[in-house]
């Protein structure tokens, strides 16, 4: 699994050649895929930022107390089951 020095140098030269020619992607599909990936990552980072902001800024110091609710029967009584 070790990469030889020649392969590493060839890869570095290829990357440097792409940087010099300002052609980072081989086709427009590569560009579109990269834009979609960046959009996805931006959305994930924005959601994480919102979660952190909500946890840090909107938390109350004490535990929340909710009033107990009265349980109401749900549904309709089936009178056919009555004797």
UniProtKB/Swiss-Prot annotation:
Its main location: membrane. It is a single-pass membrane protein. This is Small integral membrane protein 22. Residues 60-83 are annotated as: Disordered. CDD domains: CASIMO1_SMIM22. The gene is SMIM22. Disulfide bonds: none annotated. PANTHER family: CLCA DOMAIN-CONTAINING PROTEIN, SMALL INTEGRAL MEMBRANE PROTEIN 22. It holds the Pfam family SMIM5_18_22. Interacts with CANX and DDOST. Interacts with SQLE; this interaction modulates lipid droplet formation. Keywords: Endosome, Membrane, Transmembrane, Transmembrane helix. One of its GO terms (biological process) is regulation of actin cytoskeleton organization. The lineage of its organism: Eukaryota, Metazoa, Chordata, Craniata, Vertebrata. It is found in: Membrane; Late endosome. One of its GO terms (cellular component) is membrane. May modulate lipid droplet formation throught interaction with SQLE. Residues 63-75 have a biased composition (Basic and acidic residues). The chain crosses the membrane at residues 32-52. InterPro entries: SIM_Modulators, SMIM5/18/22.
């Amino acid at each position: 699994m070790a990469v030889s020095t020649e392969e590493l140098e060839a890869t570095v030269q290829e990357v440097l050649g792409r940087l010099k020619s300002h052609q980072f992607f081989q086709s427009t599909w590569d560009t579109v895929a990269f834009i979609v990936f960046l959009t996805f990552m931006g959305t994930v980072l924005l959601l994480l930022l919102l979660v952190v902001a909500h946890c840090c800024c909107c938390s109350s110091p004490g535990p929340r107390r909710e009033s107990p609710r009265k349980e109401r029967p749900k549904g309709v009584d089936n009178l056919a089951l009555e004797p």
